[in-house]
């Protein structure tokens, strides 16, 4: 019985480590900044505050990526938003337009904005 509990504890710890910020940690924030400036800053603004020139014309306004609300989102949630968009907002999905690596890089950069 103790062996089963030990195995379950090891599996739970492994799952916690594996499900952590792997996408952000695996991404390159410097590369992500370049992708962000090219594809995201028009709406989200140069510092990710949701105040880009195109974003000013949108309703609802683009997310402030430096906010506590964004910081509370899991990496998986943010990655899904980047990949699939966020209806009914103007946020489009970037899967197919950006590689998985570029999406990971953007996620790492977005995470760096809230620090």
Language model features with spans:
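Phosphate-binding glycine-rich loops and adjacent basic patches that engage nucleotide phosphates
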Residues: 2, 37-45, 65-73
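Periplasmic/extracellular electron-transfer cofactor-ligation site
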Residues: 27-29, 33-60, 84-93, 113-115
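Post-cleavage N-terminal segment of exported redox proteins
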Residues: 1-28, 77, 81, 109-115
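Extracytoplasmic electron-transfer domains, predominantly the class I c-type cytochrome c fold
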Residues: 59-113
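Amphipathic alpha-helical interaction segments
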Residues: 14-15, 43-44, 102
